[in-house]
Amino acid sequence: MTIMIKKSDFLAIPSEEYKGILSLRYQVFKQRLEWDLVVENNLESDEYDNSNAEYIYACDDTENVSGCWRLLPTTGDYMLKSVFPELLGQQSAPKDPNIVELSRFAVGKNSSKINNSASEITMKLFEAIYKHAVSQGITEYVTVTSTAIERFLKRIKVPCHRIGDKEIHVLGDTKSVVLSMPINEQFKKAVLN
């Protein structure tokens, strides 16, 4: 199977690919993880799917979306700042044109694993966010994520550290943390072979 990585902003994304992203997010977040989300027609979207959003996503040979990220600038409204500010403790929410929030990371359940650790799609998506950061002058990503993803990042050696109050919070049924992922040589080595 050939995997194509694509990037688009909200206003330019082809409608079928956008629908594929929302369908995958529904499958992962609503069906698999059972998050309490408002969905319509088996598609998951929220108020952050707007003109500020960018998407990096993977499509297979048949143009099915098999993985995705949503990227939001920290200079406007974004999830950590507006939905989960309690995770920051006494720290202010990042507000910097060179810091971007990653959210809604999803990979299809049928992605085959390589080296018993990560799917090819997952690794290509991490490579893509690294390359995107370098090309756009992004120095850091921030994300509200699960402790399982935190462990995964450490296993594949993507640099990350907790920010905010640095505590584990239970969001729904998910143990969650806020992470910073600096764009540096360690990130490059972790995702580029």
Curated annotation (Swiss-Prot):
Lineage of origin: Bacteria, Pseudomonadati, Pseudomonadota, Gammaproteobacteria, Vibrionales
Reactions catalysed = a fatty acyl-[ACP] + S-adenosyl-L-methionine = an N-acyl-L-homoserine lactone + S-methyl-5'-thioadenosine + holo-[ACP] + H(+)
Q: What molecular functions are annotated in GO for this chain?
A: N-acyl homoserine lactone synthase activity
Specify the species: Aliivibrio fischeri
Annotated function: Required for the synthesis of OHHL (N-(3-oxohexanoyl)-L-homoserine lactone) also known as VAI or N-(beta-ketocaproyl)homoserine lactone or 3-oxo-N-(tetrahydro-2-oxo-3-furanyl)-hexanamide, an autoinducer molecule which binds to LuxR and thus acts in bioluminescence regulation.
> Member of which family?
Belongs to the autoinducer synthase family.
Q: Which UniProt keywords apply?
A: Autoinducer synthesis, Luminescence, Quorum sensing, S-adenosyl-L-methionine, Transferase
* Gene Ontology biological process terms from the UniProt entry: bioluminescence; positive regulation of bioluminescence; quorum sensing; signal transduction; symbiont-mediated disruption of host cellular anatomical structure
User: What is this protein identified as?
Assistant: Acyl-homoserine-lactone synthase
Known EC number(s)?
A: 2.3.1.184
Query: InterPro entries per the record?
Result: Acyl_CoA_acyltransferase, Autoind_synth_CS, Autoind_synthase
